[in-house]
Amino acid sequence: MSDDHPYHVAITATAARDLQRLPEKIAAACVEFVFGPLLNNPHRLGKPLRNDLEGLHSARRGDYRVVYAIDDGHHRVEIIHIARRSASYRMNPCRPR
């Protein structure tokens, strides 16, 4: 774990694929956000999701959403999915842990 951030990041294969498909400027903004402010305080920057996506959080980056899970016990933020808002909540709620 880095001394600079209280949390470290894990990116799922789905989120990595999402990043590759994003426009370059959006992808760069998402990476900067994930490895910067999000790791400092993931509870503050996102909002908790409900219903089928309970246990996940979502943070805005323009028209895009970064969906992530927080593991406080291991000080880890797992990036699950990155997509336009209109598609970001249609994901399968079953996710690796």
UniProtKB/Swiss-Prot annotation:
InterPro entries (alphabetical): RelE/ParE_toxin, RelE/ParE_toxin_dom_sf
MF-aspect GO terms: DNA binding; endonuclease activity
Effects seen without this gene: No visible phenotype in culture or upon infection of mice.
Transport is among the record's keywords: no
GO biological process: mRNA catabolic process; negative regulation of growth; RNA catabolic process
EC number of the protein: 3.1.-.-
Keywords for this protein: DNA-binding, Hydrolase, Nuclease, Repressor, Toxin-antitoxin system, Transcription, Transcription regulation
Family: Belongs to the RelE toxin family.
Complex formation: Interacts with cognate antitoxin RelB, which neutralizes the toxin. Also interacts with non-cognate antitoxin RelF in vitro, in M.smegmatis coexpression of these 2 genes increases the toxicity of RelE.
Function: Toxic component of a type II toxin-antitoxin (TA) system. Has RNase activity. Overexpression in M.tuberculosis or M.smegmatis inhibits colony formation in a bacteriostatic rather than bacteriocidal fashion. Its toxic effect is neutralized by coexpression with cognate antitoxin RelB (shown only for M.smegmatis). In combination with RelB represses its own promoter. Has been seen to bind DNA in complex with cognate antitoxin RelB but not alone.
Protein name: Toxin RelE
Source organism of the structure: Mycobacterium tuberculosis (strain ATCC 25618 / H37Rv)
